[in-house]
Amino acid sequence: MANIDYSFENSIPIGPLKIAALDSCKDFAKKVDDYIVSFRQHDAEALAQRQSMLDFRGYDSKSYLLDFSCPRFGSGEAKCVLKESVRGSDIFAMVDVTNYSLTYQLCGEVNHMSPDNHYQDLKRLIGSCRGARRVNVVMPFCMRAVSISVPEENLLTVHWH
């Protein structure tokens, strides 16, 4: 990736960054995480001056990947289990709903995950991140975007990328 000459002298992070990569997007999320870690290490001078500021807690990290899992039960149902706190964090949930290569067991049979299975796991993750400051979704294929019709006065701050 290209080097970008950018410093954070005039900006403050929203909250500690966490990348929540669902199984369908783990490889890509790892590349994003590696890039952000190296990018932020180059900003060490600005960070050293601000380490005592509360806004910069968690800014310098060896990895921003969130530790969580979405285990499935024998019935095919699943749940999201967070293994670390997300309170006050800026979460970026990454999912590839068109990744058909993932499988799960249902009544002893192997099933491939459909776009809807991936989407349901994403909803489980979002539901478990209630204490986060902000949740952003990085989803290359937004299957329900055209069917959502929300009156303007009811709009929420949800970032779909």
Predicted segments with their positions:
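PRPP-associated nucleotide enzymes
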Residues: 1-161
